[in-house]
Structures are given as structure tokens and as C-alpha cells.
Regions:
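Sec/Tat-exported extracytoplasmic proteins
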Residues: 45, 49-57, 74, 78, ...
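A generic structural signal for short, solvent-exposed coil/turn residues
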Residues: 13-18, 90, 112, 128, ...
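Active-site-adjacent structural segments surrounding the nucleophilic cysteine of cysteine proteases
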Residues: 2-4, 15-79, 124-127, 142, ...
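Active-site-adjacent substructure of cysteine-protease-like catalytic cores
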Residues: 97, 101-149, 185
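Extracytoplasmic glycan-interaction modules
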Residues: 22, 73, 84-85, 94
Length: 186
């Protein structure tokens, strides 16, 4: 009887160890959704990221998180949108550190696991010149899916990894990480 209880206890501990060692199937962040204005995917994406960090840090969203105001400030008619460099400058002016880089699947997963949403530039099929910005908020490695806050469509839009990578590779996998500057940083 005593050995049966010990054996049962060992099985429970082993089972818990196995369960807790497994990584979650889907990693996603609850990033607020902002619907874009016409040709305003960049400004909506900026607003979503700022609102996410404001929520994480427990602070009121500032004026800098208003997509309409961002659009008025940064929109370039000849570009049909916002330049990537202007997005970075906007974040920096609002006390964010920015890192633009050529992303890949592994980097997306790493940043999301650390609680960092990413803005990605896509060139959807059929678009001749303009880019489309989305916020990558989750990945499901088992199903090869991404979860996007697509300002033109909806929150938590599921997209197949292969479709995403095709549209992303047309922009050389342009990715933007914006994180708040540490307190006292400047």
C-alpha cells in the first residue's frame, strides 16, 4: 500500500513536470485594435503599439496614441501612406526605442514570447506600389499561423505562415520593434 502511494505520487509529479515543461501552443498578446482611416495602416499600427505599451505600464494613453492625429502628422500623399522612417521617428519622439530589422519566424516568436508586438510591412498580392502595415500579435507554430491586428480588417486575423512570408518577403521582411525607453532614459 505504501509503495502504491509513492508510485502514484511519482506519477503525478512526472505528469506535472511534463505538462509544465510544454510550451504553449499559441503565443499571443492582447494588443488593442485600431481600425485604420483611408490609407492609414501605418498610423493605426503605431497607435496600437503605443496603446499596448500604455496598458502594460498602467498609464493613460497619451495624445500620441491617436491614429487620426498620427495620420495628419505623418501622411505623405505621394507615398499613399507613411514612410517607415517616419514611423520610427514618431516612436522616438514619444520616448520609445526603435529597432528595424529583417525579421524571420524565429525572431517573431522570440519577441512575442517576451511580450513585444511587432509591426511588419507586407506587400499583399495585387498591390502595385503601396505597402501595408500590420501588427504581429501572435504565432501558432503547430498550425503555422500568425495572428495579426490588421488595421484594414480586424483584430486577431489568422494568416497562414506561407502567405504571410510571401507578402513579407516582398518588403525584405521589414519589421519594426518599438519598446518604451526605460525610466530616466532619454
Amino acid at each position: 500500500m505504501f509503495y502504491s502511494l509513492i508510485r502514484a505520487g511519482v506519477l503525478v509529479v512526472c505528469a506535472f513536470g511534463i505538462v509544465s515543461a510544454q510550451e504553449p501552443t499559441v503565443a499571443w498578446l492582447d494588443v488593442p485594435f485600431v481600425k485604420q482611416l483611408e490609407k492609414g495602416c501605418g498610423s493605426a499600427s503605431i497607435a496600437m503599439v503605443i496603446q499596448y505599451w500604455d496598458k502594460q505600464l498602467g498609464r493613460q494613453s497619451e495624445d500620441g496614441a491617436d491614429a487620426e492625429q498620427i495620420q495628419k502628422e505623418l501622411y505623405v500623399p505621394g507615398a499613399d501612406g507613411i514612410y517607415a522612417s517616419a514611423m520610427e521617428e514618431y516612436f522616438q519622439e514619444h520616448q520609445f526605442l526603435t529597432f528595424s530589422f529583417r525579421g524571420d519566424w524565429k525572431l517573431l516568436q522570440q519577441h512575442l514570447k517576451k511580450g513585444r508586438p511587432l509591426i511588419a510591412a507586407l506587400k499583399p498580392s495585387g498591390m502595385t506600389s503601396s505597402l501595408h502595415y500590420v501588427v504581429v500579435v501572435g504565432v501558432d507554430p503547430k498550425q503555422d499561423l500568425l495572428l495579426l491586428n490588421d488595421p484594414a480588417r480586424r483584430k486577431l486575423l489568422k494568416q497562414d505562415r506561407s502567405d504571410f512570408e510571401k507578402e513579407w518577403s516582398a518588403t525584405d521582411n521589414w519589421t519594426l520593434l518599438a519598446v518604451p525607453q526605460p525610466e530616466g532614459g532619454g
